[in-house]
Amino acid sequence: MVLSEVDIVKADPAAASQPLLLNGDADVAQKSPGSVAENNLCSQYEEKVRPCIDLIDSLRALGVEQDLALPAIAVIGDQSSGKSSVLEALSGVALPRGSGIVTRCPLVLKLKKLVNEDEWRGKVSYQDYEIEILDASEVEKEINKAQNTIAGEGMGISHELITLEISSRDVPDLTLIDLPGITRVAVGNQPPDIGYKIKTLIRKYIQRQETINLVVVPSNVDIATTEALSMAQEVDPEGDRTIGILTKPDLVDKGTEDKVVDVVRNLVFHLKKGYMIVKCRGQQEIQDQLSLSEALQREKIFFEDHPHFRDLLEEGKATIPCLAEKLTSELIAHICKSLPLLENQIKESHQGITEELQKYGVDIPEDENEKMFFLIDKINAFNQDITALIQGEETVGEDDSRLFTRLRREFHKWGIIIENNLQEGHKITSRKMQKFENQYRGRELPGFVNYRTFETIVKQQIKALEEPAVNMLHTVTDMVRLAFTDVSMKNFEELFNLHRTAKSKIEDIRTEQEREGEKLIRLHFQMEQIVYCQDQVYRGALQKVREKELEEEKKKKSWDIGTFQPSSTESSMEEIFQHLMAYHQEASKRISSHIPLVIQFFMLQMYGQQLQKAMLQLLQDKDTYSWLLKERSDTSDKRKFLKERLARLTQARRRLAQFPG
């Protein structure tokens, strides 16, 4: 179960009045009479707080942030805003200082509170390097060394992370990401576009909805003019995930203290998460080597004695310990709120990458025997997909249709063409009969059908279907060829030589099978020039035609009471129409079924079988295995990249599943 914000509050009911212990305050707390009760509450709080932060830290360490945004607190501020001093006060260690750009890489600051240990431990890690630090005074040197390694010796910046992990009884449970200070113009040997680069880096982090933006602003400047708060407002216009930190309250001009108090009380520039005010070591105190623990004591005294700011201390809005408590609570609540969505995003990304990785297959083996088995598997998979196409059993997308379904549509069109041919034939027959009666009728008695005329009309009608049949063959051939090519693309896309070879086979066999299919179709229409039908079949068809016409004649309304006698021409035409209709029905049955059968046999069955045999024959030449299995130059890199992402997300899912919340 994921912790809710209510659970966090319940875990430590004294949180509002008992700030987390930092540095020198620890000794004071040990002498307090309520320390045992506080320790029990602290223990309950630790059981819920630390696992949440550790979970996100472990996901970040895995590199999951390369794939998905993780809950975080990003610290931003203008140069000389006091950002480094705030982080030093929270962490208890000195961080790089100086003029110009000091933070040149994003610094992930992991603070882990040790409850029952007095030992201080530190660790710096970046790229593939990691070093344990046993003395807090070594931190600054190691951070500078890391920045020089990553971003160079100059003043350049880098997007690559440096992680500083500190475990101590004097730090809060908290993880922050420190970003470079905002600069407006390049100075000294800084790159001319340094300001743009820094803002781009900062925006990369603060625009994520999963990030709480911690904006550090000096108390002695107009808050509306600060670049850091302006950038935060751009990505968080409602101020829902921004916290303001005012620094250097000792430098506020007299008479303007009330304005600072109004800012901290959220009356000037509203932020949903509000403001805090802190006083860190000044430059003179740093030069005098004032310890961080003593600086905390002085900070507390400063706010207690200040006539305007003491109320802010009582409200829990002043001092580093109160800030640490607020940040920890905000981070935990933010993590708990984000976990369900994060878990779902990781699941979806894992599924998507798994599907994408399947397209790239497995790594090509180096051993020759293993190459043979690998090639056999690839060709067998291809042949199985071809078989599925031939049998109309291939798997298709929701909006797609199977090849056989599309072929049936073409064959249905063929039936319509035949029917239209019959209708057109009636018109032609009528004209020819009129011409015969008017110009060529010889000694035949009225009403007699000229068989040669009947035969000529039948042959012409059927002959007119030959080219449409051949055109249908070409259409179906293209459909099958494209389907086979898609199968090759699916199975051999990354093996470009094998894909090219398969396409060549597909084209060669297509030409051969199309030629054979066309030959048989034309042969069929040559045979159809022989007017023939079984006697009993033809008599039955003719009888049905006559019965149908007789039935239709009875339904017609008579316009004349007297007996109507049709002319000899009309009788002859009616008779020949009946014969043409009867013969056309039987011939149409033959043609409408036989032509699709021929096309299916040559352009689907034989085409597919010959292609499968041709692909298996590739296995006979072992010298071509390496050539056939040659990948595209970027395929191996892409596969490796996807595998690394999949491994990260797999571990992330495992850790989320093990999370005790």
UniProtKB/Swiss-Prot annotation:
<feature type="region of interest" description="G2 motif">
    <location>
        <begin position="102"/>
        <end position="104"/>
    </location>
</feature>
<keyword id="KW-0472">Membrane</keyword>
<dbReference type="GO" id="GO:0016185">
    <property type="term" value="P:synaptic vesicle budding from presynaptic endocytic zone membrane"/>
</dbReference>
<comment type="function">
    <text>Interferon-induced dynamin-like GTPase with antiviral activity.</text>
</comment>
<keyword id="KW-0391">Immunity</keyword>
<feature type="region of interest" description="Stalk">
    <location>
        <begin position="367"/>
        <end position="631"/>
    </location>
</feature>
<keyword id="KW-0007">Acetylation</keyword>
<feature type="binding site">
    <location>
        <begin position="178"/>
        <end position="182"/>
    </location>
    <ligand>
        <name>GTP</name>
    </ligand>
</feature>
<dbReference type="InterPro" id="IPR022812">
    <property type="entry name" value="Dynamin"/>
</dbReference>
<feature type="modified residue" description="N-acetylmethionine">
    <location>
        <position position="1"/>
    </location>
</feature>
<dbReference type="GO" id="GO:0045202">
    <property type="term" value="C:synapse"/>
</dbReference>
<dbReference type="GO" id="GO:0005789">
    <property type="term" value="C:endoplasmic reticulum membrane"/>
</dbReference>
<keyword id="KW-0832">Ubl conjugation</keyword>
<dbReference type="GO" id="GO:0031623">
    <property type="term" value="P:receptor internalization"/>
</dbReference>
<dbReference type="Pfam" id="PF02212">
    <property type="entry name" value="GED"/>
</dbReference>
<dbReference type="GO" id="GO:0005634">
    <property type="term" value="C:nucleus"/>
</dbReference>
<feature type="region of interest" description="G5 motif">
    <location>
        <begin position="279"/>
        <end position="282"/>
    </location>
</feature>
<feature type="region of interest" description="Critical for lipid-binding">
    <location>
        <begin position="554"/>
        <end position="557"/>
    </location>
</feature>
<feature type="region of interest" description="G3 motif">
    <location>
        <begin position="178"/>
        <end position="181"/>
    </location>
</feature>
<keyword id="KW-0256">Endoplasmic reticulum</keyword>
<dbReference type="GO" id="GO:0098793">
    <property type="term" value="C:presynapse"/>
</dbReference>
<feature type="region of interest" description="Bundle signaling element (BSE)">
    <location>
        <begin position="341"/>
        <end position="366"/>
    </location>
</feature>
<dbReference type="InterPro" id="IPR019762">
    <property type="entry name" value="Dynamin_GTPase_CS"/>
</dbReference>
<dbReference type="GO" id="GO:0008017">
    <property type="term" value="F:microtubule binding"/>
</dbReference>
<comment type="subunit">
    <text>Homooligomer. Oligomerizes into multimeric filamentous or ring-like structures by virtue of its stalk domain. Oligomerization is critical for GTPase activity, protein stability, and recognition of viral target structures. Interacts with TRPC1, TRPC3, TRPC4, TRPC5, TRPC6 and TRPC7. Interacts with HSPA5. Interacts with TUBB/TUBB5. Interacts with DDX39A and DDX39B.</text>
</comment>
<keyword id="KW-0051">Antiviral defense</keyword>
<keyword id="KW-0963">Cytoplasm</keyword>
<dbReference type="InterPro" id="IPR030381">
    <property type="entry name" value="G_DYNAMIN_dom"/>
</dbReference>
<dbReference type="Pfam" id="PF00350">
    <property type="entry name" value="Dynamin_N"/>
</dbReference>
<feature type="binding site">
    <location>
        <begin position="247"/>
        <end position="250"/>
    </location>
    <ligand>
        <name>GTP</name>
    </ligand>
</feature>
<dbReference type="Pfam" id="PF01031">
    <property type="entry name" value="Dynamin_M"/>
</dbReference>
<dbReference type="GO" id="GO:0005886">
    <property type="term" value="C:plasma membrane"/>
</dbReference>
<dbReference type="GO" id="GO:0048471">
    <property type="term" value="C:perinuclear region of cytoplasm"/>
</dbReference>
<dbReference type="GO" id="GO:0003924">
    <property type="term" value="F:GTPase activity"/>
</dbReference>
<feature type="domain" description="GED">
    <location>
        <begin position="573"/>
        <end position="661"/>
    </location>
</feature>
<dbReference type="GO" id="GO:0045087">
    <property type="term" value="P:innate immune response"/>
</dbReference>
<dbReference type="GO" id="GO:0051607">
    <property type="term" value="P:defense response to virus"/>
</dbReference>
<keyword id="KW-0399">Innate immunity</keyword>
<protein>
    <recommendedName>
        <fullName>Interferon-induced GTP-binding protein Mx1</fullName>
    </recommendedName>
</protein>
<dbReference type="InterPro" id="IPR020850">
    <property type="entry name" value="GED_dom"/>
</dbReference>
<dbReference type="GO" id="GO:0005525">
    <property type="term" value="F:GTP binding"/>
</dbReference>
<dbReference type="InterPro" id="IPR001401">
    <property type="entry name" value="Dynamin_GTPase"/>
</dbReference>
